[in-house]
Amino acid sequence: VWAFDLSADAMARVVAGGGAAAASAVDAATGADVIVTMLPAGSHVKAAYEGQLFSAAQPHAVLIDCSTIDVATAKALGEAAAARGLAMVDAPVSGGTAAADAGTLTFMVGGPDAAFEKARPILEKMGKAVIHAGG
C-alpha cells in the first residue's frame, strides 16, 4: 500500500503500519489497482482527479472518493471517470476518527452498480457497513 498525505504524522502512521510513503498523490496512484481519496472539499477532489489521478489510473483501476462533497462535483467526476473507462464511486463516511481507528466506518456509496461491486471488497475492509445509495 502506497499512501500520500500532507501530514507528516499521518504518513509516519502509514509507514509504522507497513505501508510505503509516496512523495506525491500521483506517485501513490501510479500503477495502483485501487485509488482511495479523502479530501476536504469538492474543489480539492476535482483538482486531484482532473489534475493528475485520472491520468495516473490504470485502465482497470477502481477509484473511490471518500470525501464529503457536493452532489454535482461527485456526479461530474463519476461521468469523467466513465468517459475514460474507469470505475469510480463516491463513498463518504460516517463514524468519525474512533470508527476509522476501529475499522467500523459506515460508507454511503453512490455510483454505477458495476463500479460499486468493484469497490465493495475494499470498503468492507475499511468499515462495517457499506450501503449502495444509488447511481
Regions found by a protein language model. Name each.
Residues 4, 38, 91:
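The conserved SAM/SAH-binding core of class I Rossmann-like methyltransferase domains
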Residues 8-10, 28, 95:
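Conserved beta-strand edge residues that scaffold enzyme active sites
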Residues 19-24:
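Conserved SAM-binding strand-loop segment of SAM-dependent methyltransferases
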Residues 48, 68-135:
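Rossmann-fold dinucleotide-binding core
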Residues 1-17:
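NAD(P)-binding Rossmann-fold cofactor-contacting core
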Residues 10-13, 45, 98-101:
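A short acidic, helix-capping loop that chelates divalent metal ions and anchors anionic groups
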Residues 6-7, 41, 112:
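Residues in the short beta-alpha loop(s) of Rossmann-like NAD(P)-binding domains
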Residues 25-87:
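Rossmann-fold NAD(P) dinucleotide-binding segment
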